[in-house]
Amino acid sequence: MKQKIVLATGNKGKVREMSDVLADFGFEVVAQTDLDIESPEETGLTFVENALLKARYAAKVSGLPAIADDSGLVVEALNGAPGLYSARYAGIDGETADAENRRKLLRDLADVPVGKRQAKFVSCIVMLRHETDPSPIIAEGECIGEIIFAEKGENGFGYDSLFFTPEKGCTFAELETVEKKKISHRARALAVLKSKLGA
């Protein structure tokens, strides 16, 4: 019988991604929303701290092992912004948040020339065996690129249509989902997690 593990998200895409990796290690992933667990306030100052807060809260409320990720876009010319606030950069929630976040990013970078628009997507995954686990498994991944001047591509979400990856010569939004999953920050963090679980 597989050991249940709570994923601190309601995002079905993340549940599928994590399930694919963790199934090989005897885990059955359950979304926290399926257990009526709310998300805690993200008060950390780093991606690691926020992922740890979310995993610890899910483990505490469920009594099960837990896993969480925190991720975002880090733009050098903006001193790391949007960073921890990537999902709410424009200060709004809801269906229009992604579009508003992209508009704000373009406004904030309006005077920044080519060659100074370096950015990276960062993902940090934390896994706890129980609420008071003193040695959580931490896996980080990143994808380096730059922010272009106008949106390009129809796939993806968030900042994908503005994030140009030199590795593929296009934006994340121009990649097919299968291709993006191979090189994304989350895919790289999951690869690190997999290697740590297999160790």
From Swiss-Prot:
Name the active site residues: 70
Name of protein: dITP/XTP pyrophosphatase
Q: What is its EC number?
A: 3.6.1.66
Which residues are connected by disulfide bridges in this protein? none
Per the UniProt record, the source organism is Mannheimia succiniciproducens (strain KCTC 0769BP / MBEL55E)
Q: Which UniProt keywords apply?
A: Hydrolase, Magnesium, Metal-binding, Nucleotide metabolism, Nucleotide-binding
User: Which transformation does this protein catalyse, written as a reaction?
Assistant: XTP + H2O = XMP + diphosphate + H(+); dITP + H2O = dIMP + diphosphate + H(+); ITP + H2O = IMP + diphosphate + H(+)
- Which residues does UniProt call coiled coil? none
Name of one Pfam family that matches: Ham1p_like
Subunit structure and binding partners: Homodimer.
The processes (GO biological process) annotated in the record are: nucleotide metabolic process; purine nucleoside triphosphate catabolic process
Any idea what job this protein has?
Pyrophosphatase that catalyzes the hydrolysis of nucleoside triphosphates to their monophosphate derivatives, with a high preference for the non-canonical purine nucleotides XTP (xanthosine triphosphate), dITP (deoxyinosine triphosphate) and ITP. Seems to function as a house-cleaning enzyme that removes non-canonical purine nucleotides from the nucleotide pool, thus preventing their incorporation into DNA/RNA and avoiding chromosomal lesions.
List ligand-binding residues for Mg(2+).
Answer: 41, 70
Q: Which HAMAP family match?
A: Non_canon_purine_NTPase
> Does Ion transport show up as a keyword for this record?
no
The record's annotation in InterPro entries points to: dITP/XTP_pyrophosphatase, ITPase-like_fam, RdgB/HAM1
User: A Gene Ontology CC term for this entry?
Assistant: cytosol
